[in-house]
Amino acid sequence: MVKEIARTIEIPEGVSVSLSQDVFTAKGPKGTVERTFWYPGIKIEVREGEVVVDAESSRKEQKAMVGTFASHLKNLIIGVSEGFECKMNIVYAHFPMQVKVEGKTLVIGNFLGEKKPRIAKILGETKVKVSGNEIVVSGINKEDVGQTAANIEQKTKIKRFDPRIFQDGIYIVQKA
């Protein structure tokens, strides 16, 4: 007895998807995203109004990959229709930080009184807005938005001071 392992993802209005060979493309009001999906024994089909991810057998690793592919496809579809956003707070008590966006980098100046600015990478087509003590990281690719926010948070990690006293830094406060 072979169990059917299939996941279906609904395609919302205003989003069009296509699959050519192993490259999945999603187009929506926010933009276009492409991603390659390939794993032995797993098929992805685009039907009317839905995407179906199915496995040839019911092995444990194929079942896991079906769930992984379904989650990635769902995130691509949500990204082009709604987008992803991550809010961060700039916290300082001892030395006021100057934060600004320069091209594909975020420059953090005067962190803990340091003379040399710290630089965090902005990945892909992610947009970063700085207003007062708040940073908003937004984009259509969930992985790029999350990694950009993590890059910013990591650049302000305190290593040579007591973190109970020096709580300066940039912290993620909300993911949406």
From Swiss-Prot:
**What cellular component GO annotations does this protein have?**
cytosolic large ribosomal subunit
Ordered alphabetically, the record's keywords are: Ribonucleoprotein, Ribosomal protein, RNA-binding, rRNA-binding
Q: Which Pfam families match?
A: Ribosomal_L6
Q: Which GO terms describe its biological process?
A: cytoplasmic translation
Gene Ontology molecular function, alphabetical:
rRNA binding; structural constituent of ribosome
Q: So what does this one do?
A: This protein binds to the 23S rRNA, and is important in its secondary structure. It is located near the subunit interface in the base of the L7/L12 stalk, and near the tRNA binding site of the peptidyltransferase center.
Q: How does it assemble?
A: Part of the 50S ribosomal subunit.
The name this protein carries in UniProt is Large ribosomal subunit protein uL6
The organism named in the record is Methanosarcina mazei (strain ATCC BAA-159 / DSM 3647 / Goe1 / Go1 / JCM 11833 / OCM 88)
